């Protein structure tokens, strides 16, 4: 199957990692906190220390990845940090992905972050992916039901892998 990268592999990311592994995928998850790496590895995923606010720290994590899941819909930080994360940092990350093996993107477009920032991030993902003909899904599955979110996110990965994503969800 495919190698999936989960950028922002916190609580929901680990649930998704477990589901993707159960579906036969290899999974790599990123965390900014080295103490959280054990939680990622406990679900069977490869842990990588990397910060989406410092895109260069994610370069190694992109190696041999087919689908990237950008799960930053409930990221924390100051309003300025979150605005940069879902705009300039996201744009830099997408630009770096173009020249890699990534051929599908899932962007979490719903969460606790200001909906206007997530909408802008979703528009950026749509524009970059459509320009590059990379399948993408804007994940808008509510976060209150963990099981429903996990199933929706895993199905989004399948859609991106199948190439029939075109921004659905």
State what each model feature region is.
Residues 4-9:
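Conserved N-terminal Rossmann-fold NAD(P)-binding element of oxidoreductases
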Residues 91-132, 137, 141:
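Conserved Rossmann-fold NAD(P)-dependent oxidoreductase catalytic core, especially the SDR/UDP-sugar
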């Amino acid at each position: 199957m495919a190698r999936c990268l989960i950028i922002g592999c916190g609580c929901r990311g680990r649930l998704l990692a477990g589901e993707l592994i159960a579906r036969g995928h290899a999974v790599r998850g990123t965390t900014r906190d080295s103490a959280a790496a054990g939680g990622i590895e406990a679900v069977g995923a490869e842990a990588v220390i990397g910060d989406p606010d410092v895109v260069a720290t994610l370069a190694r994590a992109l190696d041999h990845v087919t689908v990237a899941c950008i799960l930053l819909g409930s990221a924390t930080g100051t309003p300025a940090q979150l605005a940069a994360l879902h705009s300039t940092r996201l744009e830099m990350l997408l630009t770096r992905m173009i020249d890699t093996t990534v051929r599908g993107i899932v962007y979490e477009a719903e969460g606790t972050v200001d909906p206007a920032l997530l909408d802008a991030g979703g528009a950026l993902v749509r524009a970059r992916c459509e320009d590059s003909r990379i399948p993408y899904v804007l994940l808008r599955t509510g976060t209150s039901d963990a099981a429903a979110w996990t199933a929706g996110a895993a199905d989004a990965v399948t859609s991106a892998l199948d190439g029939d994503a075109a921004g659905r969800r």
